[in-house]
């Protein structure tokens, strides 16, 4: 920028202040110096005494200088606050005029930490979102400029090389993803009670961090939070924590001991992997799952202690692998599953205690441990036979000489592909045969298992010459594929009683597929003893063998002259996709039905279930599109997941009192299910249980306390819901897109969950009950409300909670503490009646303020409609719409008076107004002109609606028309009233 000799200098341009608090501008040619003027927003100018020849309000310096530090400088000492900066260029030679002032630059000076604070949540809170010149010790204040600091943004301090110590303010609840990651000098962080969320990688690679105390309000330490914190010596985890996430403390090299609190349920994948000096782990009583590689390669780990009364159920794959100094482990009672390679490579383990509750030990769980040092070819972990370490795997016969008495179980894959093994006789102590324990043993022809209770998945699969098996008399479970491909297996040559014991309760899918049993099928049904285990048409396109009717109650099978038998059980997926099957009679003897037993039997119209049936398992009748009726047994205990999913013609269900649980999706997409009766045993309706059903009405009895996510969602005919008592939780979108017109919520309910009634377009009346404190996001989005009456106990209204409702009036109580952004989005015909300004906490956010006028000081009845309001000059000034404008003063809000709608009342019509409370006759009616003294209280007068009122569609166009301000009487106002319907509008000028 320049000026000709004798001219006027150009004004400085490009004025700005960067993150380092350095003021810069573009140099002006021929300028001899510059004047910098800094003032506060109220016009008070700062005083600078550095240059005596300049004004005390300005600072001049050489033209070569086009920057000046605003902080850490003796020239300017600025406190935190807002300032206006402008700069003038001074002429160098005589005849050269000084420039005009530059355009004003608004500048906000941060705290000396250099943190950048940004308004969020509609201007009610602050977030720290970047670091600025932060160095050394940082204190994030509780409040900033009078408002709480509640969040630290994602990556706010990421990569800062100067910060050493951070104290987080007491109002902060959220610490963002990677907020402090890669801060190499950060040694100390103090987190307050009240923090609820710590983001992923929040402190990752803080290599100098020595100690951390996680507040009790934090429920989860997520992915990578403290990974690669090489100096982290002490971690305090408080009660309240529930989940330690994947890689949360991985690759630490200083942490020697960790105590997991009792409230933690899950320790995530790789959570403490490669903790190089970790020596001791104390596992709390609440931990249920230790996931894959959680403590893997913690090479100094010597001790793992489980709390008494532990809840541990599962150790997943490689959970403690390569912990080379771990000498022993005592697993607590209740543990059920030890995953593959769980202790793989733990070379010092010499002893382990496995409780009888364990029902599965995965392949290689104890490979390369100290247990291998014991003599003999067979490796034992406590009472489990876990490995056969022969290189040649040439065992021929397994019996008591090979498997020691007292052995409880055989782990997964121990004898897989033993090429010479011909016969197996298990000791009477063995109760479990693991997954694929003897798979593909080509010479195995005989198995005797006198006391085995569980034969696991694929245990003897593809043993091609296995002919007979003695199952003993206590067997309860044969899992899927257990004998699949044993092409010569034919136990049906024995009497049915000798084929399978009566103790069997479950047979998995395809457990006997491709055995000789398929060649002895009766009417297309494959039996093993008294169990129907499949059909001859499985996997075939040809349906010529299909049947139209099967009687399993009286089904008789000729077993080569033996006595005839009846069916007692149906295996998992036994009749899957039998399209031609129409009826089944199973009333007498079938006590067990397997998972997915009749999956997608599209022509099945009904089934009579035995009174002895106790459980209907997952997917049992899923996709039986022709099923019209089902009578549930009087002693039924449970209905599994998706048990009747998409039974499109099923009309009604009566759930007996004996039933205590219903699985998720149990009756999902039963589009013609119009009637359901709940018994006294049900306490919870699970997620999606009746989603997309044909229900018209439903009564929720007193014994039910929880209604799950989308439980009745998208049921297009559901119009009436009666909740009789004690529901404490209604899940996300539980009634979304239904045809509800009204509902009474119980006093026991404290929160209306997000999207609970989303898109229920006919819903116009809700009795909120006395307990509701919070209304979630989108809770009533797109409903049919005309008058929204928020009850006095509600404290919080979520985003878009009442958006798209076309409401004409909104009444708000003083109990409200926060109204989220756009809570009433698109309700642009409404007027808001608020008991006080306190009722509008957080109101000026988004559509709430931009489009809706407000009247303060309204009197609202317990039912939520407006009883009266005061006509006064003060009130006149407070009837407005907030409009965002941009002018010379920048972007700001202005108020304009607008035509507003009078309050509504469900089922009644406005008859006019009276100055006496409780009046039955209106004093002012259509066409009246009247004067109203300042402070007059007008009371609405209501009457019953009649047919001519058309209350659902007709609304008052104008009630107060032209509030006459031509009168200069300070004590009165004049209005003309026009009444025409249920709601009204008036214009105040």
Can you describe what each PLM-predicted range is?
Residues 76-95:
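Beta-strand-rich modules
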Residues 21-30, 913:
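Conserved aromatic anchor
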Residues 19-23, 896-898:
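Structural beta-strand segments of beta-rich domains
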Residues 38-78:
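Recognizes extended acidic, P/S/T-rich segments that occur
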Residues 116-121, 133-151, 161-174, 184-197, ...:
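Structural signature of tandem-repeat unit edges
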Residues 93-109:
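Extracellular fibronectin type III
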Residues 154-156, 176-179, 199-202, 222-225, ...:
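Consensus positions within tandem repeat domains that build extended binding/scaffold surfaces
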Residues 523-524, 631, 722, 856-949, ...:
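Secondary-structure capping and domain/repeat boundary segments
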